[in-house]
Design a protein with these regions (language model features):
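The substrate-binding groove and active-site-proximal loops of carbohydrate-active enzymes
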Residues: 102-103, 144-157, 198
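Short acidic, gly/pro-rich beta-turn/loop elements at beta-sheet edges
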Residues: 47, 111, 156-158, 187
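Aromatic- and acidic-residue-enriched carbohydrate-binding clefts of CAZyme catalytic domains
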Residues: 183-202
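Generic, well-ordered alpha-helical scaffold segments in large soluble proteins
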Residues: 56, 119, 163-166, 170, ...
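Acidic, contiguous N-terminal accessory segments
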Residues: 2-144
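Short, surface-exposed, polar/charged, turn-prone segments marking secondary-structure boundaries
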Residues: 65-66, 129-130, 173-177, 202
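A conserved hydrophobic secondary-structure block that centers on an alpha-helix together
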Residues: 149-182, 189
């Protein structure tokens, strides 16, 4: 990048990871336009994770990062494995050459992505310095969710999608969608059209 301005990432996020070890003396990883996001070849869920991360980074920084199969080389690497014992746990390790997010499952890697996402500042047109760090994290509770009642009030589709995205950002893994109640029936069932033809207007 020709731009000399650099913004620094901040790992003090919500929820705070279980273990954060910042290497103050080590060189940071510089997130720039040339950074690549890599994932295990042939794994569609990990490819989707990589594409999610690329989308998040574009929203935050304006950078369009290349997504490619393979887990060798410099860049952001998503991989299965690591030492997390919880299936939704993950490890995030940053060196000057790589950002490696690993977990025993694709879900664990996804939550590692959320931690990276929250650490990156909203900064268009500048490079981002990610301090060298090792983060080990896992959820304390297997059920982490929130409830949204759409039976009593109308919600735009985009609002519901935004709500789900905020759940993911905060490492929630359950979306309790309250679709029906006395006030109305909100979910369309093709074989039972009267549920929405009549029930949605109550």
């Amino acid at each position: 990048s020709c731009n000399t301005e650099v913004k620094e990432a901040n790992y003090q996020i919500i929820p705070l990871p279980q273990e954060i070890s910042v290497m103050d003396q080590a060189a940071p990883f510089i997130l720039s336009n040339g950074t690549k996001i890599m994932y295990p070849e042939g794994n569609e869920k990990m490819q989707r994770n990589a594409e999610f991360l690329a989308s998040y980074i574009k929203d935050l920084t304006g950078k369009s990062l290349a997504v490619q199969a393979g887990t060798d080389g410099k860049g952001i690497i998503l991989q299965l494995g690591g030492n997390a014992k919880n299936p939704e746990g993950y490890q995030l390790k940053v060196t000057s050459d790589q950002v490696v997010i690993s977990g025993p499952t694709e879900a664990g890697v996804f939550y590692g992505i959320q931690t990276l996402r929250k650490s990156i500042p909203v900064a268009q047109g500048v490079d981002i310095a990610l301090p060298a760090v090792e983060i080990n994290d896992y959820p304390r509770f297997s059920y982490r969710g929130a409830h949204l009642d759409v039976s009593r009030h109308f919600f735009p589709v985009d609002s519901v999608k935004r709500f789900i995205d905020m759940l993911a950002l905060h490492n929630m893994n359950r979306f309790h969608w309250h679709l029906t109640d006395d006030q109305g029936w909100r979910i369309e069932i093709k074989g039972l059209p009267e549920l929405t033809e009549v029930g949605s207007k109550r």
